UniProtKB/Swiss-Prot annotation:
Name of this protein: Protein NDRG2
Gene: NDRG2
Transmembrane parts of this sequence: none
Gene Ontology annotations for the cellular component aspect, listed alphabetically: cytoplasm; Golgi apparatus; growth cone; nucleus; perinuclear region of cytoplasm
Species this chain originates from: Bos taurus
Subunit-structure text: Interacts with CTNNB1.
Biased composition (Basic and acidic residues): 1-14
Amino acid sequence: MAELREVQITEEKPLLPGQTPEVAKTHSVETPYGSVTFTVYGTPKPKRPAILTYHDVGLNYKSCFQPLFQFADMQEIIQNFVRVHVDAPGMEEGAPVFPLGYQYPSLDQLADMIPCILQYLNFSTIIGIGVGAGAYVLSRYALTHPDTVEGLVLINIDPNAKGWMDWAAHKLTGLTSSISEMILGHLFSQEELSGNSELIQKYRNIIAHAPNLDNIELYWNSYNNRRDLNFVRGGDTTLKCPVMLVVGDQAPHEDAVVECNSKLDPTQTSFLKMADSGGQPQLTQPGKLTEAFKYFLQGMGYMASSCMTRLSRSRTASLTSAASIDGNRSRSRTLSQSSESGTLSSGPPGHTMEVSC
């Protein structure tokens, strides 16, 4: 497996006081389905997995994940893990447009590229963070390589193939809307699009004027042709690792994520529905997502000495108390966060805790 390119860059971003610029290395490797580009931050930590991210359609790793990984509270996490940001083929900055007739990889084939990345880096296990199409790719990878995935954070995942009604609606929309507008409707809620905030204007401009828009359309088509993941609770086709499902309240994929939650192992799955976050919680609510991710890592046995917010401390105390009563700490967790109410629900149906945050 040959390396095509390796360059060293310094991320351009506002720095926190006393923080030095992160050095990143961008690599490209050949796979059976073409070249894939990924960027590595940090150095491998002994006995710790890499954090590997995979972005959604219309985005690349920077536009999808930068606000989250640049968030102040996230710095404690990234100091403890090497991270690998994968760009889907043709989505990396400066990517040339694929020639006419190019056969873009399916989402299953994109998942099959990940072992080539890990082999090149000599990484054995990962914690995956995926959004939309990227969440599907990481889930497919976890199904075929369960021993290499320690945990998954899946934002806006839709594990189902498109049905006939979905296809009809998609084709009808395609007659009246541009590719960029259809992708925006996939990324953001109708309320957000109607409000036309600065965030929406920014991403509308990014997608509509992307020099690789033809490549983006190919990724979009692969997403719309995805196969059903066929998750079955209690069956062989399920995710074996701890999973945190995340979706914004009233987000385009809310129903799909709720359905996905119903199909996964309740002892391994947490469900976080975030209020006031829209379709892309990693962009609009990086603080809440960082806190949830930190707690997720602590549940996996990492960062036990990490500083915890009042919300996490209250939640830990409540769960410890509950565990001492029922003797079973492995159970489904549903987290519902609101900036107004600070309500946190956890555990079996009907078990609700009120905490301040």
